[in-house]
Amino acid sequence: MKFLVMPGDGIGPEIVPVAASALETLNRKLGLGISLETVDIGFASLETSGNTFPDEALKKARDADGTIMGPTDTLAYPHLAEGGRGPSAFMRTGLDLYANIRPAKTRSGVPSA
């Protein structure tokens, strides 16, 4: 199985490698045949490629069996004409996904909003 790892912005480069490390540990223990490839998105990509979500990232996401995508700072990106693509939106439209689902659970004793 191929996973594409995209660290993103802000806390992403700190937390996404931890998730990738967890997959690598599972792979070693269970022999799942997982391979990971990292592609920069967000400000790191803007600096190197002039775009916050390069076409290469979408192509690799299409070819992968799964993706790990860190948070992105879309509101701070430059205008689209200046390379400021919103990675989440481009992933959803480029992979024909219908929603950006964020699972959540409520816990007893903890008030919900």
Where are these regions (language model features)?
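N-terminal basic/disordered segments at the start of proteins
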Residues: 6-21
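Short catalytic helix/loop segments, enriched in acidic residues and glycine
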Residues: 20-30
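Alpha-helical scaffold elements adjacent to nucleotide-binding pockets in ATP/GTP-utilizing enzyme cores
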Residues: 18, 22, 87-90
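Anion-binding alpha/beta catalytic cores of soluble intermediary-metabolism enzymes, centered on
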Residues: 1-10, 28, 35, 40-113
